[in-house]
């Protein structure tokens, strides 16, 4: 078992319930299990990404690394948002340059016949097995996830996603619905296996205007949020620009990018929805003293908010030094909220 002491119930789940009234806020990091860690790179030298994503023992080991190395308050499952195309009967490869490749490419209505949905329990059984291993070992909450349907469609279709949406909306919406249905089944499998919360990454929603978001993304996200029985966090690189649209979906939490002050954004978010974020990931290139200073600015601005979860405004970048990531996490863990004893580390 990991050695970190854990509150019961964990502060991360308390914050998701908007009830983390005592002590510091919880902290975890998007992409915390990833390329900035030398331990991850050691595994990467031995295995192709396909094997890393689809081997339960490697899923377990990589998911657990940041718990042991940087001491975050929650684990997020090591997986890929393109598991859904696998469950649609497509092939996903990671050639190393230019990002993942989905084959065959789905570029229009005529290509929908290439999609052959499979039961997620069969196609993605390795995810379930990895979750089981983690739940036997870790003492912090485990976050499962999937990609937003629009984002998954973007990867499946390439650069022509909006062309398809406008030129043949009927078939485009059929694909979005198919992705949504498989995503719900996939997340339900994760919940049954033991994850404590879900985050939906609709990363490419920043390609959309507000009107387009309400048409092409929001209805499908709504279906997912309403279908899942554990707390759901929504994230997009455009979340600071889609505050009211995200709030309308009534998730348990919204994770915001760094383009707008979080203490201002929260004024537009009901007190029943937690807020997560939102340090600019590139600040972690700065010296640790600067990282501490910038992190403390956000902590002070959000001090006393029982629904605050500390995170970056996007995933940690692959060339950030581990000590800099640890400086961010340690700053949060050493933060003394109003009414606590100064200098006391609350783990």
Segments from the language model and where they lie:
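Short, basic, glycine/proline-bearing loop/turn elements
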Residues: 41-53, 108-120, 247
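N-terminal small/glycine-rich loop or linker at the start of catalytic domains
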Residues: 20-51, 81, 86-96, 104-107, ...
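Active-site loop segments of alpha/beta catalytic cores
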Residues: 123-347
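N-terminal basic, low-complexity leaders that serve as flexible interaction/assembly modules and, when applicable
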Residues: 1-96, 222-223, 322-347
């Amino acid at each position: 078992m990991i050695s970190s002491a854990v509150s019961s119930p964990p502060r991360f789940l308390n914050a998701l319930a908007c009830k983390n009234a005592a002590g510091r806020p919880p902290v975890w990091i998007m992409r915390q299990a990833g390329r900035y860690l030398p331990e991850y790179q050691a595994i990467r030298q031995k295995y192709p990404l396909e094997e890393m994503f689809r081997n339960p023992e490697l899923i377990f080991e990589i998911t657990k690394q940041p718990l042991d190395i940087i001491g975050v308050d929650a684990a997020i499952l090591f997986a890929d948002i393109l598991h859904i195309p696998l469950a649609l009967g497509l092939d996903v490869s990671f050639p190393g340059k230019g990002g993942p490749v989905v084959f065959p490419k789905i570029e229009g209505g005529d290509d929908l016949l290439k999609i052959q949905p499979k039961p997620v329990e069969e196609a993605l059984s390795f995810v379930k097995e990895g979750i089981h291993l983690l739940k036997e070992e870790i003492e912090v909450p485990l976050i499962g996830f999937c990609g937003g349907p629009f984002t998954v469609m973007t990867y499946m279709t390439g650069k022509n996603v909006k062309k398809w949406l406008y030129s043949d909306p009927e078939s485009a919406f059929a694909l979005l619905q198919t992705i949504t249905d498989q995503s719900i089944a996939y997340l339900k499998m994760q919940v049954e296996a033991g994850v404590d919360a879900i985050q939906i990454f609709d990363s490419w929603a920043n390609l959309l205007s507000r009107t387009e978001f309400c048409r092409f993304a929001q209805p499908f996200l709504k279906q997912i949020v309403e279908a899942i029985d554990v707390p759901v966090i929504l994230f997009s690189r455009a979340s600071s620009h889609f505050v009211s649209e995200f709030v309308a979906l009534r998730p348990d939490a919204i994770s915001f990018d760094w383009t707008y002050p979080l203490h201002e954004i929260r004024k537009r978010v009901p007190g029943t929805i937690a807020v997560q974020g939102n340090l600019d990931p590139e600040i972690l290139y700065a010296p640790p003293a600067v990282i501490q200073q910038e992190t403390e600015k956000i902590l002070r601005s959000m001090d006393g908010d029982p629904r605050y979860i500390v995170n970056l405004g996007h995933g940690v970048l692959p060339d950030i030094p581990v000590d800099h990531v640890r400086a961010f996490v340690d700053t949060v863990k050493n933060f003394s909220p109003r009414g606590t004893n100064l200098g006391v580390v609350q783990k």
